[in-house]
Amino acid sequence: MRWTVGPAAGGKINRTMYLTPEELKSHMYAHIVEEITEGDEQIVLQAIEAAVEEVRSYLRPRYDTDRIFAAEGSERNALVLENTKIVTVWNLIKLSNVETIYEIWKERYDRVIKYLEGVAAGTRTPSLPLLTDEKGEVRIKMRCGSNPKFR
């Protein structure tokens, strides 16, 4: 999420989001979101912010999350966007179980978290921009290890 202040925003803070409330329609009907949040868009925005931050936390050690979440429209990574939507819907349905099947969303959320844990551990490698240093060279954490010892 990026924040801008200026005349175009009427001197107020204007949020430009990685994911908009309208884009959640692909995962949850608008009338259900409306019922869960009682029409309060701030609840939806907070759920999106929390989801972005949760997904970002798994990607941050290795990937350039500022670039990933600054992307707009078709420039966004489809899998990161999909996972962010699922985490957002999970954040919303925790408030209420209106016309949703809790177990299905719990299973989807758990699957996303398992995938993100794999990304964080380095066993899953999405096509995302890697972190770079001041010279523009990719920063790679050095990891050492060995095979289990035989006794």
Language model features by range: what are they?
Residues P61, N77-I101:
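Ordered, amphipathic secondary-structure segments that act as subunit-interaction surfaces
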Residues R2-G6, G11-K12, W90-R151:
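Short loop/turn elements at secondary-structure junctions
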Residues G39-Q42, Q46, L79, N83, ...:
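Alpha-helix boundary/N-cap detector
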Residues M1-N77, K135-R151:
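Conserved short "hinge" loops at termini or chain/domain junctions
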Residues E54, N83-K85, G122-R124:
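Functionally constrained cores in energy, signaling, and assembly domains
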